[in-house]
């Protein structure tokens, strides 16, 4: 017989971190892990809506699980590698996608087509996850984690623009 999904250990408003520490569900570290989970789900929706980015977004979801483990582990040693090479991989993708896009001279509004809207939503969730992790007290996550989330929101922005362009949508711009 399989075990039950629920344990009832969280019914009192606490949960367990990967470090083993019991924490209030409103603890900033628990909230940060929740934001990363929401980001991964948002990226999953974007993958479904914009198949050309499926493999790239799937690899990002994997990276987000590693980041979640790092954040949840606190000071506990875990056998994961997350460094500047992860950030550099995103930068390469940002540059590749940007090179094929028209120059952006105005602010754009999300909402022209579903694929770009889902990518923009994931971008906004990435920004929130970045803010939550940036606010964590000791132990702070590795610098590469914050840099990765910062680049990720940039990548999601250019992918949203690419989705609009490849789908034949015209970007809705704010005239300044």
Q: Where are the predicted features?
A:
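Phosphate/pyrophosphate-binding loop motifs in nucleotide- or prenyl diphosphate-using proteins
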Residues: 1-176
């Amino acid at each position: 017989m399989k075990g039950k999904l629920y344990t009832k250990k969280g019914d009192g408003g606490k949960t367990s971190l990967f470090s083993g520490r019991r924490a209030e569900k409103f603890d900033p570290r628990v909230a940060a892990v929740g934001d990363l989970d929401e980001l991964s789900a948002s990226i999953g929706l974007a993958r479904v809506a914009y198949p050309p980015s499926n493999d790239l977004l799937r690899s990002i979801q994997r990276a987000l699980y590693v980041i979640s483990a790092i954040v949840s582990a606190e000071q506990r040693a875990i056998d994961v590698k997350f460094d500047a090479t992860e950030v550099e991989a995103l930068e390469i993708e940002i540059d590749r996608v940007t090179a094929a896009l028209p120059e952006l001279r105005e602010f754009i509004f999300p909402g022209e087509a579903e694929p770009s809207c889902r990518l923009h939503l994931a971008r906004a969730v990435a920004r929130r996850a970045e803010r939550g992790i940036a606010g964590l007290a000791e132990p702070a996550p590795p610098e590469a984690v914050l840099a990765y989330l910062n680049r990720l929101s940039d990548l999601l922005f250019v992918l949203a623009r690419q989705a609009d362009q490849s789908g034949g949508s015209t970007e809705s711009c704010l005239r300044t």
